[in-house]
Amino acid sequence: MTSSWDCERHGAVHPLHVVARPTVEALAAAGLYKVASTSGVPLWVPLPVLPGWTLTGIATAGDERSAAKATVVAMSGPSPLGGPADLLVIAEEPGVGVGARFAGLDEIDPGPTVAGPPEAKVEAAGHPTALWRSPSADDRAAFVGEAMGVWLWAVLWPPAAELVLLEHVTLHDLRDVAHASL
């Protein structure tokens, strides 16, 4: 008996565990602090939080027998052009496909998207990190790059919310011991 799922087209499918309301109690109950400290991929959080933005969800992909293969942090706040906006910051090992799925792609990895000059930059763990525009569904904008040896995705709704990436976005990995008290 196994808890793994396989797709003929995409291979292994890792279970996605979602913390719907990321209160301190919910995060503790979900064991997220343990996940953050034992995850195989970064748990990226924009710090300081963008003005007017709030944490709205956290998810991990993987099973209880191994470290998380992907992490997702959801944020909501004002779009630079007015109205509400959503941002997903996703870290994943190559071949997992969580970022591509949220971007609205049929593929697992970004493929030839990561070429040429980048269209956005963030700071991840103190390092400038290039992001390239990825194909995406029409109702969102997606960017992808590499940080700490894994894919880093930023998926934003609506597409005009991509202007958020023009701000100085600084991502911190909650696995870092400096963030243990958060």
Please tell me what each predicted stretch does:
Residues 54-133:
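Short, solvent-exposed recognition patches
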Residues 7, 75-77, 144, 154:
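Short beta-strand element of the conserved SAM-dependent methyltransferase core
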Residues 44-56:
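Proline-anchored loop/turn motifs at beta-strand termini and strand-loop-strand connectors
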Residues 1-36:
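N-terminal cysteine/histidine-rich coordination modules
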Residues 115-182:
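A short, solvent-exposed beta-edge/loop patch
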Residues 50-52, 80-82, 146-151:
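Short, solvent-exposed coil/turn segments at beta-strand boundaries
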